[in-house]
């Protein structure tokens, strides 16, 4: 048998850090990159006698996320203790939601909305701390301990690493649009565990799955799933059996490695958290949060196509990232969507890609580009000169108005002035005039070029064409 004879089955458990200034059960801050152990309260350190106090903002963000994926909101959920020992888990247990999660039965669409990936549940839980290993010592940083996570659990509906990657991108897009998670995988605020198994094509039974922990980039998700699927296929084709293990992905070697044998839920001895009351959510609260949801990416894309006449490809590019969509929205407040799309996707994206920076870090903000488009639309400068101004704006950060003034780039629209220039060019090139009149109409471009050369590109193309047509007959 070959790889083509096997089907890969994948389910993802995505850990999304809630965009909250404080932790799930304490008032400690959640800023990234601070000094070790500087954002730790007595609750986070599990000092005796301390009690958790629920951060209700995190509840609202979980509800918001559930509504964004058309899920059911559990009107009465509660927290449980997941018991296990690890050096960076001060309590000796994690507060999570095992029996009654806050969100159930959602869906995310991939493959151009043609395939539905079911979401089994979203529950809130605490993050653990971080172990920092040196040669002979291990240090523990509790800054991350107690940070609120949403664990978003998909059903095993994914069938390839490419689908898993697209699912992660789509989920991250939704989270960023609603603002419940910043989706920054480099900072660890979005990561996932991948449950991978294989089965013969046509089989409905699931194979033995292995869980690959803590994948923190789309590229690693793809590499880890591809390697693990191939590893399992080789074992099965050689007559072996798959052991249900928890794995780590070695990014240097590009291989999965056994971390430990996979535990069952009974190993964690779950029981209800005695220090927290059940979380009761009214329908009025759910309706209020639903009414405050922003326009989601799929809705925005359809609006751009149906109402603004943008083609599907450009609409997809613009809505793929919330910051890009916000930038575009600022442009179309004053300008036609066609000119806005061109300057955003061609001019700005071209320079951003070349400079290897994202739109958030762009030296040209939306209001600055909008001002430049004002000058092009009202004829102050030509589109060609607009690109020169744009380049200077990108390099210096100066506004278009200042550059136009400093460079003396205002378009010449005075008919008499342009007529005088054209008369001089026509008189100096009578041979070309005769050739043009005898049928060599391509010479028209020569005369336009001479006018632009004489005016350093500042002559209004419309006025030039009008006067030149009269002169050449």
From Swiss-Prot:
One Pfam assignment: GatB_N
| Organism placement in taxonomy | Bacteria, Pseudomonadati, Pseudomonadota, Alphaproteobacteria, Rickettsiales
**What is the catalytic activity of this protein?**
L-glutamyl-tRNA(Gln) + L-glutamine + ATP + H2O = L-glutaminyl-tRNA(Gln) + L-glutamate + ADP + phosphate + H(+); L-aspartyl-tRNA(Asn) + L-glutamine + ATP + H2O = L-asparaginyl-tRNA(Asn) + L-glutamate + ADP + phosphate + 2 H(+)
What biological-process GO terms show up in the record?
glutaminyl-tRNAGln biosynthesis via transamidation; translation
The kind of enzyme this is, by top-level EC class, is ligase
Function of the molecule: Allows the formation of correctly charged Asn-tRNA(Asn) or Gln-tRNA(Gln) through the transamidation of misacylated Asp-tRNA(Asn) or Glu-tRNA(Gln) in organisms which lack either or both of asparaginyl-tRNA or glutaminyl-tRNA synthetases. The reaction takes place in the presence of glutamine and ATP through an activated phospho-Asp-tRNA(Asn) or phospho-Glu-tRNA(Gln).
Question: Domain of life, per the record?
Answer: Bacteria
What is the name of the gene encoding this protein? gatB
Q: Which UniProt keywords apply?
A: ATP-binding, Ligase, Nucleotide-binding, Protein biosynthesis
Q: What is this protein called?
A: Aspartyl/glutamyl-tRNA(Asn/Gln) amidotransferase subunit B
Assembly and binders: Heterotrimer of A, B and C subunits.
* PANTHER family per UniProt: GLUTAMYL-TRNA GLN AMIDOTRANSFERASE SUBUNIT B MITOCHONDRIAL AND PROKARYOTIC PET112-RELATED, GLUTAMYL-TRNA(GLN) AMIDOTRANSFERASE SUBUNIT B, MITOCHONDRIAL
């Amino acid at each position: 048998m070959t790889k083509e004879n096997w089907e890969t089955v994948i389910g993802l458990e995505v850990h999304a850090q809630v965009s909250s200034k404080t932790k799930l059960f304490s008032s400690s801050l959640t800023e990234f990159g601070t000094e070790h152990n500087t954002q730790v309260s007595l609750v986070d350190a599990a000092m005796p006698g301390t009690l958790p106090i629920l951060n209700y903002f995190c509840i609202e963000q979980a509800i918001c996320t559930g509504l964004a994926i058309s899920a059911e909101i559990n009107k009465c959920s509660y927290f449980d203790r997941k018991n296990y020992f690890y050096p960076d888990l001060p309590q000796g247990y994690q507060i999570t939601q095992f029996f009654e999660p806050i969100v159930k039965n959602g869906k995310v669409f991939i493959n151009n909305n043609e395939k539905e990936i079911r979401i089994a549940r979203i529950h809130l839980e605490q993050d653990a701390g971080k172990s920092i290993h040196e040669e002979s010592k291990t240090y523990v940083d509790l800054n991350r301990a107690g940070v609120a996570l949403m664990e978003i659990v998909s059903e095993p509906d994914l069938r390839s690493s490419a689908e898993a990657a697209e699912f992660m991108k789509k989920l991250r897009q939704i989270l960023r649009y609603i603002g419940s998670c910043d989706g920054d995988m480099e900072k660890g605020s979005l990561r996932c565990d991948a449950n991978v198994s294989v089965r013969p094509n046509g089989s409905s039974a699931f194979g033995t799955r292995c869980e690959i922990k803590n994948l923190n980039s789309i590229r690693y998700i793809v590499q880890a799933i591809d390697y693990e699927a191939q590893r399992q296929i080789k074992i099965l084709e050689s007559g072996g059996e798959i052991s249900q293990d928890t794995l780590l992905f070695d990014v240097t070697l590009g291989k999965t490695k056994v971390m430990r044998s996979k535990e069952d839920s009974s190993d964690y001895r779950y029981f209800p958290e005695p220090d927290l009351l059940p979380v009761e959510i009214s329908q009025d609260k759910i309706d209020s949060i639903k009414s405050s949801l922003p326009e989601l990416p799929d809705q925005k894309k359809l609006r751009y196509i149906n109402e603004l006449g943008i083609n599907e490809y450009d609409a997809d590019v613009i809505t793929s990232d919330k910051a890009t969509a916000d930038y575009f929205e600022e442009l179309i407040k004053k300008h036609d969507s066609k000119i806005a799309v061109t300057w955003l996707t061609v001019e700005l994206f071209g320079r951003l890609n070349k400079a290897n920076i994202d739109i958030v870090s762009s030296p040209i903000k939306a209001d600055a580009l909008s001002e430049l488009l004002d000058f092009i639309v009202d004829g102050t400068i030509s589109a060609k000169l607009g690109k020169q101004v744009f380049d200077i704006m990108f390099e210096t950060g100066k506004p278009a108005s200042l550059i136009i003034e400093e460079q003396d780039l205002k378009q010449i629209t005075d008919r008499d002035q342009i007529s005088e220039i054209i008369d001089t060019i026509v008189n100096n090139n009578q041979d070309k005039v005769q050739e043009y009149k005898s049928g060599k109409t391509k010479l028209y471009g020569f005369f336009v070029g001479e006018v632009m050369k004489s005016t350093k590109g500042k002559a209004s193309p419309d006025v030039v064409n009008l006067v030149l047509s009269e002169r050449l007959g």
